[in-house]
Regions:
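Conserved, well-structured functional cores that handle cations and Mg-NTP chemistry
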Residues: 1-159
Length: 159
């Protein structure tokens, strides 16, 4: 039986919550929020990143399976995937980008003397992006997609 702290909660202690809350305050990220604030959202997404989960549904199912351990992991409560999805949609992404830049600046001095390996790629490198563009169904009748909404799927190949 585990008698110590969980690894996730030990890693979470290294994250400076004060700096995170300062960034949230500048972007007014917790304005009109009751339960699921920016910190809880960050913790759940951080959990998903560290456990290599592929989707919000996977994150929520995994947390729901470990519901009795959430408090010890540092997670306030379990939320459904729709709540997490809406929070990702509505909250300003700049909060997490600024915090990411803060973390990068924090660890940059640790690697300033490290040599960057000379990376050579012999083959061509491509990036493929697939984006769905919503459009008015009244204007583009031929673009009717799921649920009677109009959309165009665009695939872009960058070299």
């Amino acid at each position: 039986m585990n008698s110590g702290k969980y690894v996730f909660s030990q890693i979470l202690e290294l994250v400076n919550r004060y700096e995170f809350e300062k960034i949230v305050k500048t972007h007014k990220g917790n304005y009109r929020v009751r339960e699921f604030n920016c910190w809880n959202q960050f913790i759940q997404l951080f959990f998903g990143q560290l456990t290599n989960l592929n989707s919000l549904r996977d994150i929520c199912l995994c947390l729901k399976a470990h519901n009795n351990k959430l408090y010890h992991l540092g997670i306030k409560n379990y939320v459904s995937h729709t709540t997490l999805s809406r929070a990702n949609e509505k909250r300003d992404w700049q909060i997490f980008a600024d915090f990411g830049y803060y973390l990068i600046e924090l660890v940059r001095p640790l690697y300033k003397n490290s040599a960057v390996p000379n990376l050579s790629i012999e083959n061509e490198l491509f990036a493929l992006d697939s984006t769905t563009i919503s459009c008015s169904i009244n204007l583009l009748i031929w673009a009717e997609g799921k649920y009677s909404r109009g959309a165009i799927k665009m695939h872009t190949l960058l070299d």
